[in-house]
């Protein structure tokens, strides 16, 4: 039952292989080494970055940690986008690294993208030494101030003793609740200072307690609205995929016999080959899906924010419909469309509670009407021509692969074609922004 404490100035072979455990050893390490140990403790395998003077001590430490694979990018913006894409594809926290000043500011677009799409990344930036902060030193920027509106949280670490706690909190904040980017800014001298290292097993954030389970009274109220509805639709967003609630969404839709419309980032949350699946809504979506929303008397919105590309003029959006809005972020509920029954909670857990609360439904008449609209107003018709149309190419790629592929797009018209002409039956098979 006696604890073993190992004291060393440099990482042992066991540390380099990532086998140090807070239960096994407490050691004295430099700040840069502490960062590497924290990354290993969080299960990080890949880092995207670009070196610079303020982060050279961290690069020196990375050389000794072979389990951390560093991917060199040409520009720091690429590092942020790569971390974003890695997080979307792997469902792990993406990590990017940049130096001070222009290196840090080059991350901004990628961080903002991750913030908008609720993608968990941890951005680590170097800064000028602590004694030079606020003195307009060479390549000094207030990156914490700059990124305050586009991060879920950010830190400026001024004591090496705080590094382990800050990184533990950063990863916890990035991946829990509504995921998002967290930036950790570290002055150069903090990388070089030494302290005793012990990675905390828990976090202590009294002001940060995401609500996971829906309020029981609101669940009952939602079940009552669902029982009364004659023309309901489900709007499933990115939050369903983030929560891993695809199975619950399918069970809920099949039990209630309610059609499902997935948003752009929600594609794959519900199989498009399913009879209850309708095409993407909004200005680039299907007319019959938009008509179903417009004529509905109940919208069950799950993990989506009622983006302007879906609603158009908010005052005219679904004028006959009551709204059940389920989201883990309370700030989203009522922000764009007023909710009749707001439910704050994790999509997976709330859907489980709703499945128990609702009775089996039958909406065949309503579905027949929607299917008739779909027959008259299909999403698109690819006409035969002697020219090669991009829509035709995308559809042929889908047929050749049988849909068993991950589709990654930039933003633009090709993105819309990829959303329209590929059927996404599996979660996380469409990566876009």
Regions found by a protein language model. Give the residues of each.
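Structural signature of the thiamine diphosphate
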Residues: 45-46, 88-99, 104-125, 148-201, ...
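Active-site diphosphate/adenylate-binding microenvironment
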Residues: 32-35, 40-44, 50-53, 58-62, ...
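Glycine-rich, anion-gripping cofactor-binding loops and their flanking helix/strand elements
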Residues: 88, 238-324, 420-433
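Phosphate/pyrophosphate-binding active-site segments
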Residues: 22, 161, 320-411, 415
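Short Gly/Ser/Thr- and charged-rich N-terminal loops/segments
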Residues: 14-21
């Amino acid at each position: 039952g006696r604890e073993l404490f190992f004291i060393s100035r440099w990482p042992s072979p066991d540390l380099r292989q990532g086998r140090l455990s807070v239960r096994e050893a407490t050691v004295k390490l430099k700040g840069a080494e502490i960062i590497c140990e924290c990354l290993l403790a969080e299960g990080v395998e890949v880092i995207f970055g670009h070196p610079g003077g303020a982060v050279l001590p961290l690069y020196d430490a990375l050389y000794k940690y072979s389990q951390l694979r560093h991917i060199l990018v040409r520009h720091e913006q690429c590092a942020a986008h790569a971390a974003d894409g890695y997080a979307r594809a792997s469902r792990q926290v993406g990590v990017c690294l940049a130096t001070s000043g222009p290196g840090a500011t080059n991350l901004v677009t990628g961080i903002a993208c991750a913030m908008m799409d609720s993608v968990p990344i941890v951005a680590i930036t170097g800064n000028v030494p602590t004694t030079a902060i606020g003195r307009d030193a060479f390549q000094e920027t207030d990156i914490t101030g700059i990124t305050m509106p586009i991060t879920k949280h950010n830190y400026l670490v001024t004591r090496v003793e705080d590094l382990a706690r800050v990184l533990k909190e950063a990863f916890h904040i990035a991946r829990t609740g509504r995921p998002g980017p967290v930036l950790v800014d570290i002055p150069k001298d903090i990388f070089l200072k030494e302290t005793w290292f012990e990675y905390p097993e828990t976090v202590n954030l009294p002001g940060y307690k995401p609500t996971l389970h829906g309020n029981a009274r609101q669940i009952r109220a939602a079940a009552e609205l669902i029982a009364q509805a004659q023309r309901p639709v489900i709007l499933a967003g990115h939050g369903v995929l983030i929560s891993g609630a695809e199975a619950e969404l399918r069970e809920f839709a099949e039990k209630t016999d309610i059609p499902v419309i997935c948003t752009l980032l929600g594609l794959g949350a519900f199989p498009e080959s399913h009879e209850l699946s309708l095409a993407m809504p909004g200005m680039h979506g299907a007319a019959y899906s938009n008509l179903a929303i417009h004529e509905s008397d109940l919208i069950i919105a799950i993990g989506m924010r009622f983006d302007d590309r879906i609603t158009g003029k908010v005052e005219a959006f679904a004028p006959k419909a009551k709204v059940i809005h389920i989201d883990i972020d309370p700030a989203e509920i009522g922000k764009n469309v007023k909710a009749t029954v707001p439910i704050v909670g994790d999509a997976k857990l709330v859907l489980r509670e709703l499945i128990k609360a609702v009775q089996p439904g039958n909406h065949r008449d309503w579905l027949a009407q929607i299917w008739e609209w779909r027959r008259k107003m299909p999403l698109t018709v690819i006409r035969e021509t002697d020219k090669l149309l991009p829509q035709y190419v995308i559809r042929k790629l889908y047929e050749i692969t049988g849909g068993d592929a991950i589709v990654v797009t930039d933003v633009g018209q090709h993105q819309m074609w990829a959303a329209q002409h590929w059927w996404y039956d599996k979660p996380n098979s469409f990566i876009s922004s």
